[in-house]
Amino acid sequence: VLAFLKVDFSVYAFNTVDRQVVCWLVKPSEMKWNNSAAKRLAQISANGGTPLAEVYDRMLHVLTSKKPDIFLTLSDGEPADANAVKLILKSYRSLGIKMTAIGVGRDTFSATSIANNLKYLGYDKVLAVSRLPDIPNRVLSILSDN
């Protein structure tokens, strides 16, 4: 959807391996979204327990140089350290980055619960999704509000 709209975007993914945060650049901004990027993204398993504040801290240097308008996080759970996430969200906002999130759950109740937790952390905009095919429309709604 974003590629069709000619929106300049990058895709990063992260999880934990042996209690260490691992971040991947799935699609750099100068590359078009393609099957290769989709396959790279699909190979990354969601295994929970990701320290979101640590991930955001690692990405801060990238965001400082790229200065995106919006940073969109898809989350399927709660961060390990809510207070640390709140602090780093403030840092990102001070750079002029609109912090948004989509809570992804297995059903409407869990998606809404995840989204409510994300809203409590201080994201500028939060949405809930329980059906993966709904994600493109949710992303569009975030972009249209910007």
Model regions and ranges:
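Acidic, glycine-rich A-domain
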Residues: 1-146
